[in-house]
């Protein structure tokens, strides 16, 4: 007698397997078809600017990432609204779909109202299945892998962790990725290769030119400083 297709309740209760998740890296065909988002925090120490959280947005098609420091989780609503408006104006495209976990910050009425105002469809992951938001989860791991190295090598104090995270994402967006045929996320999004000439190591020494009123003719014309990241340009 064949037992190949025989199952009993006890066997199912004891041996129920977890179905594998889709290994596809991308399901989008154009930029901003799908954005992954997640919030990390609170940090054990506040940054220089008072931030203890940060939120990341990852475009599924280009793998380009945006990161924003926040003092409180409640700032997510305004941060996302500003981000969606930036995408709409700078790229002439709406965010069609947004995927996140089921945390209250994403399911509250005010956040849902903002999504509806932009016509964005919200996809929530099933409880206990962080793999469905895997792009954002892996991005956090990548960010922290890059954050630790400069903090340790440059001996930068922990309160500069927020600035280190911004620097890390700026760098990640300019590193070739096998997910997008070894192009950089920057090139995949902007359709032009990134400029590398201005990149510097986090925590390295730099010299800032002083304004004429900040020194006299016998004093130094620059000040020795520590490089902590790039301005928004």
Per-segment meaning from a language model:
Residues 1-233:
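Anionic group-binding determinants
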């Amino acid at each position: 007698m064949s037992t190949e297709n025989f199952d009993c309740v006890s066997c199912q209760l004891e041996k129920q397997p977890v179905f594998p998740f889709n290994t596809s890296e991308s399901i989008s065909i154009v930029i901003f078809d799908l954005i992954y988002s997640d919030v990390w925090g609170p940090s054990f120490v506040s940054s220089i600017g008072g931030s203890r959280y940060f939120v990341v947005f990852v475009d599924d098609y280009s793998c380009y990432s945006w990161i924003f420091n926040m003092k409180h989780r409640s700032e997510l609503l305004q941060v996302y609204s500003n981000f969606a408006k930036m995408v709409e104006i700078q790229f002439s495209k709406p965010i069609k779909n947004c995927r996140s976990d089921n945390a209250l910050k994403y399911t509250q009425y005010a956040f849902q109202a903002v999504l509806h105002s932009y016509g964005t469809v919200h996809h929530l992951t099933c409880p206990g299945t962080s793999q469905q938001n895997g792009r954002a989860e892996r991005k956090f791991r990548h960010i922290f892998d890059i954050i630790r190295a400069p903090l340790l090598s440059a001996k930068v104090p922990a309160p500069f962790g927020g600035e280190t995270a911004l620097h890390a994402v700026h760098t990640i967006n300019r590193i070739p990725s096998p997910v997008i045929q070894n192009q950089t996320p920057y090139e995949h999004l902007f359709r032009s290769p990134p400029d590398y000439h201005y990149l510097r190591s986090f925590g390295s020494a730099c010299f800032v030119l002083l304004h004429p009123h900040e020194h006299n003719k016998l004093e130094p014309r620059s000040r020795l400083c520590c490089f902590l990241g790039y301005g928004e340009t």
